[in-house]
């Protein structure tokens, strides 16, 4: 009898969060109960049409993207191995990417369009770029005033590429001091109007601008109509997963197959817990700011996991690292003081057991490590890719152009 009661409670819980999801979490229309009923009774969309979403957290420092970069290198290697092509790139398997802070830099690099319409950079290229910026202690070697132009490092990587010049839709958040509200750089908006088309280098500089008393960044659209004064997205959207899902579920033109969260395949990658931050970074960042940023990121993770309900173990993967002890000396390190130590720490986090968000129960350790979850997600990406090749309509019309065999000249960002 108890088992039957538990099943009934589970069904009720799932129905409650389905209503919450449809009404509040991901921004569906605010109709009454009739609309909720129609959403629940709609015929299921084929699993071959799942929209694949990449979401990457990030802070203002290059170190904040190293865990994600290491995970993405592992993920890209896995899909290359399973696809049987060294030319395969992550942008060939994802339909949309969202990145905040250093995660926004990773998303922009992996999805920037190069020769033949192929992705310009590999995950290895992106990791190498972050490591070089770690060695140089930041995105720019020069200190700015109250307002400064985007870091020269981004100009070298992206040149004059804009949001329109990506192989798939890309979302990069920041916080606009002028309007005191979050601002989302979006290819969908850029495609509709030049007033929302920004250069990728400006978007990356904006999302990486320090929010703890550092210099803000001025950015303007390519036609000069829209201007913002930005600080890093950690203020409002350090974890952009919910923003990415909202974008997909409310953008039927690009994602006609996305009827609900069961039609999504999402991987969200964190930055590593701030308990593992280097002492130098902890000294610069107020404790309350770190707590607020981590709390907001965890809240998004918990809310997304709840919204996925019974699909949260199959359709939603969250990769997050905890503080890792140093090999020599006391304390913990996440990002570390050197690029070499940073790589070791990121790899160590991937070997940790994964942490899952559970409805009403907080967190629990999963049976798999972060690395094993990355590998399992790679299998799902390949399965989805295979279904689409079997004459299944694509989940997104974001166009990648060019086959996997199109050669792209190697360049160092």
Curated annotation (Swiss-Prot):
SUPFAM superfamilies hit by this protein: FabD/lysophospholipase-like
Enzyme class (EC, first level): hydrolase
Organism whose genome encodes this protein: Oryza sativa subsp. indica (Rice)
UniProt keyword list: Hydrolase, Lipid degradation, Lipid metabolism, Plant defense
PROSITE patterns to which the protein is assigned, alphabetical: PNPLA
Family per similarity comment: Belongs to the patatin family.
EC number in record: 3.1.1.-
GO terms for MF: hydrolase activity
PANTHER family: PATATIN-LIKE PROTEIN 3, PATATIN-LIKE PROTEIN 6
Comment on protein domains: The nitrogen atoms of the two glycine residues in the GGXR motif define the oxyanion hole, and stabilize the oxyanion that forms during the nucleophilic attack by the catalytic serine during substrate cleavage.
Annotated protein name in UniProt: Patatin-like protein 3
Taxonomic lineage: Eukaryota, Viridiplantae, Streptophyta, Embryophyta, Tracheophyta
Organism superkingdom: Eukaryota
KW Cell membrane (keyword) present: no
Active site: 100
Keyword Lyase part of the UniProt annotation: no
Annotated PNPLA domain residues: 54-245
One GO BP annotation of this record: lipid catabolic process
Record region (Disordered): 384-413
Motif (GGXR): 58-61
Functional note: Possesses non-specific lipolytic acyl hydrolase (LAH) activity. Hydrolyzes phospholipids as well as galactolipids. May play a role in disease resistance.
């Amino acid at each position: 009898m108890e088992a039957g009661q538990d099943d009934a409670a589970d069904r009720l819980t799932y129905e409650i969060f389905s209503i919450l999801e449809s009404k509040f979490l991901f921004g569906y229309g605010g109709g009454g109960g009739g609309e909720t009923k129609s959403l629940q009774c709609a015929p299921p969309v084929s699993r071959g049409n799942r929209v694949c979403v990449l979401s990457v957290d990030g802070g203002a420092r290059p170190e904040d993207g190293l865990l994600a970069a290491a995970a993405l290198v592992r993920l890209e290697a896995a899909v290359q191995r399973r696809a049987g092509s060294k030319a395969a790139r992550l942008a060939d398997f994802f339909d949309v990417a969202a990145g905040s802070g250093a995660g926004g830099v990773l998303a922009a690099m992996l999805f920037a369009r190069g020769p033949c319409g192929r992705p310009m950079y590999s995950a290895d290229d992106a990791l190498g770029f972050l490591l070089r910026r770690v060695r140089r202690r930041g995105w720019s070697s020069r200190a700015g005033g109250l307002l400064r132009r985007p870091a020269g490092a981004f100009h070298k990587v992206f040149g004059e590429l804009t949001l329109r010049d990506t192989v798939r839709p890309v979302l990069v958040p920041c916080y606009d001091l002028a309007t005191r509200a979050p601002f989302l750089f979006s290819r969908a908006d850029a495609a509709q109007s030049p007033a929302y088309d920004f250069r990728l280098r400006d978007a990356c500089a904006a999302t990486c601008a320090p929010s703890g008393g550092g210099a803000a960044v001025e950015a303007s659209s390519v036609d000069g109509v829209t201007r913002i004064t930005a600080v890093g997205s950690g203020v409002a959207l350090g974890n952009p997963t919910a923003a990415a899902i909202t974008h997909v579920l409310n953008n039927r033109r690009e994602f006609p197959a996305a009827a609900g969260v069961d039609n999504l395949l999402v991987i969200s990658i964190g930055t590593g817990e701030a308990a593992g931050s280097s002492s130098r970074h902890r000294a610069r960042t107020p404790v309350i700011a770190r707590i607020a940023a981590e709390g907001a990121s965890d809240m998004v993770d918990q809310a997304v996991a709840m919204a996925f309900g019974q699909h949260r173990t199959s359709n939603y993967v969250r990769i997050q690292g905890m503080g890792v002890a140093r090999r020599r000396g006391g304390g913990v390190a996440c990002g570390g003081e050197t690029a070499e130590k940073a790589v070791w720490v990121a790899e160590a986090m991937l070997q940790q057991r994964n942490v899952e968000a559970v409805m009403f129960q907080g967190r629990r350790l999963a049976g798999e490590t972060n690395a094993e979850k990355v590998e399992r997600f790679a299998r799902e990406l390949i399965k989805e890719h295979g279904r689409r090749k079997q004459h299944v309509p694509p989940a997104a019309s974001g166009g990648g152009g060019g086959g996997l065999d199109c050669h792209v000249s190697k360049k160092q960002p």
